Amino acid sequence: MSSAITALTPNQVNDELNKMQAFIRKEAEEKAKEIQLKADQEYEIEKTNIVRNETNNIDGNFKSKLKKAMLSQQITKSTIANKMRLKVLSAREQSLDGIFEETKEKLSGIANNRDEYKPILQSLIVEALLKLLEPKAIVKALERDVDLIESMKDDIMREYGEKAQRAPLEEIVISNDYLNKDLVSGGVVVSNASDKIEINNTLEERLKLLSEEALPAIRLELYGPSKTRKFFD
């Protein structure tokens, strides 16, 4: 008989993942400040060098040379500004990608904490079953999680029955086709008996979905609206 555990709702599972989003926001703010400061410094240095070089080149034909120098300076400044803008945009994307990658690596810490991971895993399985709504489900997991899932079967069936009501679940089969531990740190992939319908509820997939949903808002909050964008959703 398995011991009863406190199952998390899908919202509570999202709360756990949203903690990662808070971490992402904090890290991205710091990265954005560093990137902008560095870009401003590089811009001012390069602009100063250009002004100095152009001024030194002015000879007796002062007015003509000055006019040409100012035009050249304006063109060069515009080129530099565009180059710096592209550099900042590239650095921002790289920093956000790096932060999401760091957060992804921290997922293994959640899966290694059995007390924290167990209710999350049960909720991920139940959530996938509720999306599937099939009488028989095949659960693919990491090999190390098989015994844990076996111990939760009764709790999973009971919670599913309470929530699904008119779509009874007759059997849960734990597949011996295990998830790749090098690609997945936790969670499950659940499919129907024919394996034609599949629900990916791994921790990585949930973080990916969360990141895709959060990224536009994070960009807007950290960097402000795009000056070239005329319309917003």
UniProtKB/Swiss-Prot annotation:
Q: Give the multimer and partner information.
A: Homodimer. V-ATPase is a heteromultimeric enzyme composed of a peripheral catalytic V1 complex (components A to H) attached to an integral membrane V0 proton pore complex (components: a, c, c', c'', d, e, f and VOA1). Interacts with VMA5; the interaction is direct. Interacts with VMA10; the interaction is direct. Interacts with RAV1 and RAV2 components of the RAVE complex, which are essential for the stability and assembly of V-ATPase.
User: What happens when you mutate T9A?
Assistant: Increases ATPase activity 1.4-fold
Name the job this protein performs. Subunit of the V1 complex of vacuolar(H+)-ATPase (V-ATPase), a multisubunit enzyme composed of a peripheral complex (V1) that hydrolyzes ATP and a membrane integral complex (V0) that translocates protons. V-ATPase is responsible for acidifying and maintaining the pH of intracellular compartments.
Task: Enumerate the Pfam families for this protein.
Answer: vATP-synt_E
Protein name, please?
Answer: V-type proton ATPase subunit E
Any keyword Magnesium?
no
Gene Ontology molecular function terms on file: proton-transporting ATPase activity, rotational mechanism
The entry's localization annotation reads: Vacuole membrane
Q: Which domain of life is it from?
A: Eukaryota
Using the UniProt annotation, give all residue ranges assigned to the region (Interaction with VMA10).
19-38
Species:
Saccharomyces cerevisiae (strain ATCC 204508 / S288c)
User: Could you mention a single GO BP entry for this protein?
Assistant: proton transmembrane transport
